[in-house]
Design a protein with these regions (language model features):
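Residue-level signal for alpha-helical transmembrane segments in multi-pass membrane proteins
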Residues: 70-77, 150, 173, 204
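N-terminal hydrophobic targeting signals that begin at the initiator methionine
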Residues: 24-25, 214
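Residue-identity detector for glycine
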Residues: 7, 17-18
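Selected alpha-helical membrane-embedding segments in polytopic membrane proteins
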Residues: 25-126
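Juxtamembrane boundary at the C-terminal end of a transmembrane helix
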Residues: 202-214
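Cysteine-centered motifs
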Residues: 2-3, 13
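Hydrophobic alpha-helical transmembrane segments and adjacent short intramembrane/lumenal linkers
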Residues: 114-202
Length: 214
């Protein structure tokens, strides 16, 4: 590693570490805040400018990688041909494609959910602003995405159920703080959004499967 050598390479490594460590530390602090102090976290998020690029680089892609990587490691290490998402046996030759599908589905689901937020926002007196909607879709999904790291063992799928409950709670807070959805309409807004997401996911999945893509 360049970090344990002397000279220019060590200096370059120190510079890179100095650039990326503060961002990583901020991201980790935000994740912990969403899990432990969600109200405070959403207050901070609501005040921040919406940056699609930042959300993709710091949260969506890195966190979406956790579940497929853990799943592939678990399947390869323990030879347990299992799928935490669907519960069916996965053939050895399909393990990597299953991981890639999980990654693709996780990322696309976040962007689609944000689009659904934007689509139905006017029904609840909220403005259509995709970056803000993506903030809610991304930060709300953090518990489920982080829990994906535990899927190296099949039994840990139970943790995902707990994470899903916390994700629903984060959405319940976030749509009010960031999207200005009326307090009394939050449950309905989230319910409709997730129902639409589930329906679209099923349709897209069936279409891709029939086309032989997955």
């Amino acid at each position: 590693s360049c970090c344990v050598t002397a000279g220019p390479r060590a200096s370059a490594c120190a510079v890179v570490g100095g650039l990326y460590w503060p961002a990583m530390r901020y991201t980790l602090r935000r994740i912990l805040s969403l899990i432990l102090t969600p109200n405070q976290a959403w207050d901070e998020i609501a005040r921040e400018p919406a940056s699609v690029d930042l959300l993709i680089r710091r949260y969506i892609v890195p966190l979406a990688l956790l579940a497929p990587v853990a799943t592939v490691i678990g399947m390869e290490t323990f030879d347990g041909r299992w799928s935490p998402a669907h519960g069916y046996l996965v053939p050895q030759e399909a393990i990597w494609s299953a991981g890639a599908t999980t990654l693709f589905a996780s990322i696309i689901s976040i962007f689609v959910l944000a689009g659904i937020f934007v689509l139905i926002a006017p029904m609840y007196g909220s403005s259509r602003h995709y970056p803000s909607a993506l903030k809610v879709a991304t930060y709300g999904a953090v518990p489920v995405l982080v829990a994906g790291a535990l899927l190296i063992l099949p039994v840990m799928v139970m943790i995902s159920v707990v994470a899903l409950c916390h994700t629903l709670y984060l959405y319940w807070i976030g749509v009010r703080r960031v999207l200005d959805v009326p307090e009394e309409a939050r449950t309905e807004f989230i319910g409709i959004s997730l129902t639409m997401l589930g329906g679209l996911s099923s349709i897209i999945g069936a279409a891709l499967s029939s086309a032989g893509l997955f």
